[in-house]
Amino acid sequence: MLISTKKLPEISEGLISFVLKNYIVVGFWATVLNGYSYPCFEAPLTVVTDDSFFRDYQDAVVNYVYIPSYNKSVGITDGLAGSERTICDFLMYPKELGAGVYMPDIMEGYNEENDGDFSKVYDMMAELGIERGKLDYWLEHLDEYIDE
């Protein structure tokens, strides 16, 4: 068995800039770059891809999430899913993006930043064809996340 002694690359500002120019950042790193979570520099950047070659592929710095029908025209700016779109992505792709782990952070932060007004999220959900009940479920449990 070969063991590499080469140091794994760190998530740097330059790497994030490169990824934002070439991919769409989603999931945990979208919550970080939107200001709703603290960075974990050991966690790979999560990007969406419609290339089946990258299905379930992860290297030291990038985790590729294969979503062939991902709508790249709604809520994406400069390679980053915006706040509302990140919430919508967690609702549409909970398993792929780890919604159970990361959704509480963005819900709590978004709630504070927008004084409990989720109307922009509901508008984007309608545009993406997401049922209102999916967000309503998370909102019903929002107090549990805030109290933790």
Describe these PLM feature segments.
Residues 1-74:
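Short gly/ser-rich loop at a beta-strand->alpha-helix junction or flexible surface loop bordering the NTP-binding
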Residues 69-148:
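Hydrophobic alpha-helical interaction segments
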